[in-house]
């Protein structure tokens, strides 16, 4: 379901509204830091070492500082499709749909990116996320269920493609196992997770 036709320039006005303006922002550095702490804790608990992080669609890089403290040995790389942010923060320019580095990363972050892609590109992006990730993936995307029940619509960007959570999970499960809270691990990776700690099937 498309709320509006997708034609979103990710320039200064977009990031001022959704990330910098206290009255309209969708998240804060503190919230993103807590999210990074959760991701790091789950991977540590599962016994998955992290030496390289790719933040695909990193925006302002709000998780970078937290990861530097939580995973000090991990190299962080920000990937952005916004030329404005790449120029400002020196991120790597590219799309999660087809970006291919020389080597995959232990942890790939894809936070609030996939809903900006049409169905074909979103499906391609999930396949590419599997190629980008050596071990783990954190993914979050605004879903139809979130739009109906969870998000603050006065702050949430309407210029997106809404799909069910099931649509994403079905495609992710071809490559990953879900550890919970949006953290997935590659199917060939050994991760010790007790039965009652796993998400319900």
Predicted features, each with a name:
Residues 109:
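A conserved beta-strand element that flanks and buttresses the S-adenosyl-L-methionine
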Residues 112-116:
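Short catalytic micro-motifs in class I SAM-dependent methyltransferases
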Residues 1-103, 117-124, 128-131, 135-201:
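Class I (Rossmann-like) S-adenosyl-L-methionine-dependent methyltransferase catalytic domain
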């Amino acid at each position: 379901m498309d709320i509006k036709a997708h034609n979103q320039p990710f320039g200064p006005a977009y990031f001022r509204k959704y990330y910098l303006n206290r009255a309209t922002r969708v998240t804060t550095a503190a919230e993103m830091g807590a999210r990074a702490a959760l991701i790091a804790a789950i991977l540590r608990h599962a016994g998955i070492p992290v030496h390289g992080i790719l933040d695909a669609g990193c925006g302002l890089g709000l998780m970078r500082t937290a990861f530097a403290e939580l995973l000090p040995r991990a190299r962080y790389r920000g990937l952005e499709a916004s030329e404005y942010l790449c120029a400002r923060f020196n991120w790597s320019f590219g799309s999660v749909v087809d970006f291919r580095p020389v080597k995959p990363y232990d942890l790939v972050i894809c936070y609030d990116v996939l809903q900006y892609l049409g169905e074909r590109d979103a499906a391609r992006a999930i396949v590419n996320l599997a190629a980008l990730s050596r071990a783990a993936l954190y993914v979050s995307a605004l879903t139809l269920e979130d739009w109906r029940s969870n998000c603050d619509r006065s702050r949430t960007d309407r210029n997106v493609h809404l799909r069910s959570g099931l649509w994403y999970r079905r495609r992710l499960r071809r490559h990953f196992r879900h550890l919970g809270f949006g953290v997935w691990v590659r199917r060939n990776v050994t991760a010790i997770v007790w039965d009652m700690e796993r998400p319900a099937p």
